[in-house]
Structures are given as C-alpha cells and as structure tokens.
Curated annotation (Swiss-Prot):
Molecular function terms, GO-annotated: GTP binding; GTPase activity; metal ion binding; rRNA binding
Protein name per UniProt: Small ribosomal subunit biogenesis GTPase RsgA
Lineage summary: Bacteria, Pseudomonadati, Pseudomonadota, Betaproteobacteria, Burkholderiales
InterPro entries: G_CP_dom, NA-bd_OB-fold, P-loop_NTPase, Ribosome_biogen_GTPase_RsgA, RsgA_GTPase_dom, RsgA_N
Keywords of the record: Cytoplasm, GTP-binding, Hydrolase, Metal-binding, Nucleotide-binding, Ribosome biogenesis, RNA-binding, rRNA-binding, Zinc
C-alpha cells in the first residue's frame, strides 16, 4: 500500500487553515500547518474529541499559537484503544504496523497476535522486528516462537540495535520510507532506542511536544508523529510512537472483521456448513476441522475465541 495520504479537507477562507495532527494528549492536539509554519496547540470544537494523530484537519486560528479544529479530513483507516467500558481512537491514516520484540525479556505472543489482528483488520502491512539478536543464548528460542508467523507470510527482521545500530537502521529505514508506520512494543524490547536511532532528534522533539501540549511530566503518555528524514529519492514518511502496547484494543471489531483478520482462516470461511458460523462449536465448521487436523494452530484459534468473547462484553 502506498504511503500517500488521503485527500485533506480544503480550507474555505483565510480565517481557516489545514494541518496534520502530530501529537495528542487528552483534548490537547499539536498541529503542524500545511504551510510549514510553527506548530499550534489546537482543541476540538464541542465536548467530544474525535481527533487522532495522523489526521488531516482544518482549524480556525484562535490566537497566534492556538486554534480550534473544525473539520477532519477523509481517513484511510483508524485505530482504537478499547476496553469494556470505552473505546478511544488514537491514530489514523496508517499503512504499516511495526512490532518490536526481543530475544529477552520474553515477549508476549498474545500481544503479538493482537497486534497482527489489528493490522489485518485495518489493512496495514505488519512488520515484526526481533531485537537483541546479540543475546545468542535466547536467539534460537525466539526464532522458533516466531516461525509460525513467518509461515503465515509475516516479515520478520532481525536486528541488534545496541551492538549494530547502523546495520539495524539500514535494515529498517528503507522499509519505512514513503509510509506512515505505527510503532508498538512492550517495555524492555528496545522501542525507545529504535525511535532514537531512526529519528535523531526524537528526544528533543518529545520535550518540545510535551511543553506545547502542557503535558508536563506525562511525557510518555501521548501519541506522537515523527517525520522521517528523506531518503535518497526524496520520499519521507512518518513514524507514530504510541505508549501502552498492553492497552491496544480490539473490542470494537465485529465478528466478521475478526474472522477475516486471521489469514489462515480466510480461504476456509466459504467451506463452513452454516453461513453465520461463529467457528467456536458449530458442526461442519471448516475452521474447527483445520484446528483438529493441525492446519491451524490451536493457540491462534484460542486467540480468536478470546477476542470474540471480549467483543461480546463491550458496553456499546
């Protein structure tokens, strides 16, 4: 999928202007104007906040450095954080999901599986990065755990950010140019180190964004977008860093979207006896037959069943 952004709304008058939402904290948003001017702190109009990092918006100037968001451009996709009680959008207009894992500490396959489902459900290309390959005692075990995901067609890139930073950067940067990529990773996997490797002034930018959003000490609690340095052919791209891998939610997905977010399920779906099969205990279910004979891993089906259960519990 191309990294080209959806068409942004057009500002109809001189009192309005367009821009890109590059950071969010609560109802505070930082917008980079399309004309290249200084970034503005913006607020949504009304009580509801329906703005996400990566949105193209129209804002009205309220002062020299503040604005009110009055319109949101057409979105290519939208990702949420969800729990049983609420669902909050946080990133829009993505085309890749980069998941940082490591040989140590032990990474969670449940969280990896959920991230892959989110990518599939939103039309994103997943990219798995296995960091800390220099920890050789754990390397083969990590490779073995990732082999089933390679078999499903997912790309796994092995790096050692600490011991071979330039090789790691070279292995990843060309995969990121021209794309809008969301970066996810559990604590200890090396995600922050990777951001600083790919975005040389990331720490300075984070401090500036924190100040602009008045988020003070909460510097790790906001989602932010970093423009990538241009490649040799002039294509840039962006990297969106978001905290809280554990909060990455899928409860808002319908059962139909969930079943199609498992690539190994898709070819078998037409073979179920019942058109409205839930793939949990129905007779003649092609998915359950594939689980029984080993074509589909039991762990993957268990994740699907858990996600269906969680989706049924959400308060809508």
């Amino acid at each position: 999928m191309s990294g080209r952004s959806p068409k942004a709304p057009r500002a109809p008058s001189s009192t309005r202007a367009g821009g890109l939402v590059v950071a969010a904290h609560g109802r505070h948003y930082l917008v980079a104007p399309d004309d290249g001017g200084a970034m503005l702190q913006c607020f949504p109009r009304g009580k509801r906040s329906e703005v996400a990092v990566g949105d193209h918006v129209i804002y009205e100037l309220a002062s020299a450095d503040q604005g009110v968001i009055v319109e949101i451009g057409e979105r290519r996709n939208l990702l949420y954080r969800s729990d049983q009680y609420k669902s909050k959008l946080f990133a829009a207009n993505l085309d890749q999901l980069l998941i940082v894992l490591a040989t140590e500490p032990h990474f969670s396959e449940d969280l990896l599986g959920r991230a892959l489902v989110a990518a599939e459900a939103n039309g994103l290309k997943p990219l798995i990065v296995l960091n800390k390959t220099d920890v050789t005692d754990e390397l083969e075990g990590a490779r073995k755990r990732l082999e089933p995901y390679r078999a499903l067609g997912y790309t796994v890139v092995e790096v050692s950010i600490r011991t071979q930073p330039e090789a790691a950067r070279a292995a990843l940067i060309e995969r990121l140019h021209g794309h809008s990529t969301l970066l996810l990773g559990q604590s200890g996997m090396g995600k922050s180190t990777l951001v600083n490797l790919l975005i040389p002034d990331a720490e300075v930018a984070t401090r500036e964004i924190s100040t602009a959003l008045n988020s003070g000490r909460h510097t790790t609690t906001f989602t932010r977008l970093y423009p990538l340095p241009d490649s040799a052919d002039g294509t840039g791209g962006s990297l969106i860093d978001s905290p809280g891998f554990q909060e990455f939610g899928l409860h808002h997905l319908t059962e139909g979207r969930l079943e199609r977010a498992f690539p190994e399920f898709r070819p078998l779906l037409p073979n179920c006896r019942f058109y409205n099969c839930h793939h949990l205990h129905e007779p003649g279910c092609a998915i359950l037959e594939a689980v029984a004979d080993g074509r589909i891993r039991r762990e993957r089906h268990a994740l699907y069943a858990q996600l269906v259960h969680e989706a049924s519990q959400i308060v809508r």
